[in-house]
């Protein structure tokens, strides 16, 4: 890899030029309002990620000048050189968080600092420039305030926030980019799955496909992790399943579910009531909902909570011995999603999630959405407007 261009942490411009700006600041925001505002959709008709608000946030960066002033402007197409590194070598990353209109009509963000932390880590892994996480979050809040009427007046819908960071240097060399663009777009959304917000999903598990591997970027939110998963997702659908259960290694370790983290609520091998999820070992995305569920379960203190490896043999044995209570995915888009079946080695494994309530998954969903929609006060939220 050619790392001669821009790999120094102390890049400077041409001799005699001023020092590059190390970060953008929210106080420098330049806001240009849209002159024509679009009609707001009925929240009950929303299809995930297909409708966008009136405005967007953009911030440009170059090695020579550093960060330019952040701008909020009418939503518009990007103008990129066809040689931009994001288009050829996937020098990019994204984030996903939501704004919720509470029962008190206040607009809240849910644990956005965790998203900013993860975005920063992804940027470092992608060799994209550093930024001030607090300043970016403040810029995002200003964008949400401007488009606050797009936050659905509904407790079954929300405003999805998509920060994105891409390399824009017009060069076909495989190297760290000397130009980049950070932008944020907003989209009002309903349930992520067409089956509904809390209907169980079926999974397809086949070890011939791998989502991530040790030493890779599976713990970063990069588009390449998702684009490369689509072929397996299509095969899952062909096998009448809704999502892929990603396996890893010779022991077929259970890792993630589609775009979600995975939880298993069961009686473990030692006869203990346990909520288990795979550990953050570099192939698991450190999800905000994952962390929130672990935090809640630890606080409740009612059963063992573990970050541990789980294999398909562990699961099939537990199902045969009637030790599995619930299995569910978690993520910003879906919050909590029950699992009903797994197609593995041409056999369907029935997971009794719905037969068991699902008491725990329902309790977690209720607790998290109570916080998100302001039915319960919590320091996990930031009030925007």
Swiss-Prot record:
Pfam family, one: Aminotran_4
InterPro entries: Aminotrans_IV, Aminotrans_IV_CS, Aminotransferase-like, B_amino_transII, BCAT-like_C, BCAT-like_N, BCAT_family
Expression by tissue: Expressed in muscles.
Single GO MF annotation: L-valine-2-oxoglutarate transaminase activity
Entry's EC annotation: 2.6.1.42
PROSITE patterns given in the database record: AA_TRANSFER_CLASS_4 (PS00770)
Recorded catalytic activity of this chain's protein: L-leucine + 2-oxoglutarate = 4-methyl-2-oxopentanoate + L-glutamate; L-isoleucine + 2-oxoglutarate = (S)-3-methyl-2-oxopentanoate + L-glutamate; L-valine + 2-oxoglutarate = 3-methyl-2-oxobutanoate + L-glutamate
GO cellular component, one term: mitochondrion
Modified residues (N6-(pyridoxal phosphate)lysine): 221
BP GO annotations: L-leucine biosynthetic process; L-valine biosynthetic process; lipid metabolic process
Top-level enzyme category: transferase
CDD domains: BCAT_beta_family
Cofactor list: pyridoxal 5'-phosphate
UniProt keyword terms in alphabetical order: Amino-acid biosynthesis, Aminotransferase, Branched-chain amino acid biosynthesis, Cytoplasm, Lipid metabolism, Pyridoxal phosphate, Transferase
PANTHER family xref list: BRANCHED-CHAIN-AMINO-ACID AMINOTRANSFERASE, CYTOSOLIC, SUBGROUP IIII AMINOTRANSFERASE
Assembly behavior: Homodimer.
Family listed: Belongs to the class-IV pyridoxal-phosphate-dependent aminotransferase family.
NCBIfam families: ilvE_II, PRK13357.1
Function as written in the Swiss-Prot or TrEMBL entry: Catalyzes the first reaction in the catabolism of the essential branched chain amino acids leucine, isoleucine, and valine.
Name of the protein in question: Branched-chain-amino-acid aminotransferase, cytosolic
Organism: Ovis aries (Sheep)
Gene assigned in the entry: BCAT1
């Amino acid at each position: 890899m050619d790392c001669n261009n821009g790999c120094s942490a102390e890049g400077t411009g041409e001799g005699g030029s001023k020092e590059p700006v190390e970060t953008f600041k929210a106080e420098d925001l330049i806001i240009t309002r849209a002159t024509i505002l679009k009609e707001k959709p009925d929240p009950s008709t929303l299809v995930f990620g297909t409708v966008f608000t009136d405005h967007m946030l953009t911030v440009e960066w170059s090695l020579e000048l550093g960060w330019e002033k952040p701008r909020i402007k009418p939503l518009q197409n990007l103008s990129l050189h066809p040689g931009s590194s994001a288009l050829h070598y996937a020098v990019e990353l994204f984030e996903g968080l939501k704004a919720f209109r509470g029962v008190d009509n206040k607009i809240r963000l849910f644990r956005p600092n965790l998203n900013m932390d993860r975005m920063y880590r992804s940027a470092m892994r992608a060799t994209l420039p550093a930024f001030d996480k607090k300043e970016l979050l403040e810029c995002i809040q200003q964008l949400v305030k401007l488009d606050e009427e797009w936050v659905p007046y509904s407790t079954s819908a929300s405003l999805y926030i998509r920060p994105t960071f891409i390399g824009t240097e017009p060069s076909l060399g495989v190297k760290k980019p000397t130009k980049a663009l950070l932008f944020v777009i907003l989209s009002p959304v309903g349930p992520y799955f067409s089956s509904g917000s809390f209907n169980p999903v079926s999974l397809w598990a086949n070890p011939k496909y791998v989502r991530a591997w040790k030493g890779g970027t599976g713990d970063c939110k990069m588009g390449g992790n998702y684009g490369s998963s689509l072929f397996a997702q299509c095969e899952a659908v062909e096998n009448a399943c809704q999502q892929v259960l990603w396996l890893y290694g010779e022991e077929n370790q259970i890792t993630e579910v589609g775009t979600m983290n995975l939880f298993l609520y069961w009686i473990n091998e030692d006869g203990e009531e346990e909520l288990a999820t795979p550990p953050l070992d570099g192939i698991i995305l450190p999800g905000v909902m994952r962390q929130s569920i672990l935090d809640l379960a630890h606080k409740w203190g009612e059963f063992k909570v573990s970050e541990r490896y789980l294999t398909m043999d562990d699961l099939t044995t537990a199902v045969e011995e009637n030790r599995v209570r619930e299995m569910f995915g978690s993520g910003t888009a879906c919050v909590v999603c029950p699992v009903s079946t797994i197609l593995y080695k041409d056999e369907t494994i029935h997971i009794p999630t719905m037969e068991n309530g699902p008491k725990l998954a329902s309790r977690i969903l209720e607790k998290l959405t109570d916080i998100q929609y302001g039915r319960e006060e919590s320091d996990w939220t930031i009030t925007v407007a």
